[in-house]
Amino acid sequence: MLTGQECLEVSDSRITASTVEMLDCDKEYDIAVIDEAQMVADDDRGHSWTRAILGTLAGEIHICMSPVAKDVVIHLINLCHDEYEIREYERKTALKLEDKPFSFPQDVREGDAFIVFSKKSVLNIAGRLEENGIKPSVIYGSLPPEIRRRQMTLFNEKKTQVVVSTDAIGMGLNLPVRRIVFLEVEKFDGVSRRPLVISEIKQIAGRAGRFGLYDTGYVTALGQKNLNYLKNTLNIPEQDIDIVSLGFPQVLLTMDAPLDAIIKLWHEAEPSAPFRKINVDEILFLYGYAYKERYFIADFDDKYLLYKMITCPIDIKDRELVRQWLRYCMSYTSDISLDKPDKHSKYQGLMKYESYYKKLDLYYQFSVRMGKIVEEDWLENERDKTQAKIMQLLSKSKDEYIIRCRYCGRILPIGNSRNICRDCYSMIRR
């Protein structure tokens, strides 16, 4: 299995499974399977599905998707002048929206998966469940992949009774979930807080009712207002996807112009339907960050090399990580291996170790991109130790993560956005 974070090798294996970003389009396969192809419209990752559909070299390609993506995927296939065959399948377990809204914690049942949309909310709900004697597994985006697998294993083996997750549960996770419970029906999408759209609801709700374990999967929401939103949204016919995300074509790097100018020029040109170009803000942010130190970066004028650097996937909101990335840009020619990440961090507790794990990921990804030798024994040992510490912290009481009124310490209702209870708010307003 190959992802941007790890490479898990099995001797004599004839099958390679990878994230879509890690697909080698220069390698020829006997058969290829591209899953979740409705993601071609995704603003962040969609261009990788577009690249896979247009660029996979295989005698036979199976493209699995939601029906709403069928026409746009056929359009991509026709651009390649390839033949295709359509096969449609029905969901094997029924999916039922419950009539009664969910009450927390009275209605908690074994096999439930609770959906919220931030790490803070995941740990808050997990802490509340523990206070009620219920053991949860937790899943959220910044958890290392091995920790996610271990949390899933705890649930699969019934060592935990429920799961608390972000929408990370919607893709690539196969869990014995009986019921999906939406505790929130709004999410922050990086720009603003907005209601979930029908495709997001269906993607998550579809995790309820594992085939072979349950005949029916159930879906509900916290409170009548949220349940009504689910009912109303699910009754709206889902619109066909009419957008395909398009990534930056590296062939343009041959142009005689600075890299940032080329990227901006490409992005300003209007694409033909159904294509929509990716957002290049993060790439240009990293370019600008590197440009300030360009005299200390070897071969800064090599656009192919620089493009590799600025497209290295990192969380630009984590400034410790960005500083580490810049150090690698400035020092990658000084030795056969990159410097090991700094363990010191401004963060404490769980966030400290999650941040360090991201630094280890950056060490690995930047090394692979720039052809540096990865000190694999050291890296594996550091990852193991960091994962063990994260698991240890997750196994402890999560009382500190429960969101309480900042004045009286009372536990706040789920979804409260003020960090203050109603009584204290009324007193302050007098």
What positions do the PLM features span?
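Post-DEXD/H (motif II) to motif III coupling segment of the RecA-like Helicase ATP-binding lobe
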Residues: 38-90, 94
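Conserved ATPase-coupling elements of RecA-like P-loop NTPase cores
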Residues: 25-29, 37-50, 173-176
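Conserved strand-helix element at the start of the C-terminal RecA-like helicase core
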Residues: 62-64, 70, 107-132, 136-140, ...
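Non-catalytic terminal extensions of ATP-dependent helicases
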Residues: 249-430
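Conserved segment of the helicase C-terminal RecA-like domain
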Residues: 69, 175, 179-189, 193-234
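Conserved helicase motor
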Residues: 2-10, 18-22, 119-120, 138-150, ...
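Walker B catalytic acidic pair
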Residues: 35-37, 184
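Conserved two-lobed SF2 helicase motor
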Residues: 12-26, 155-174
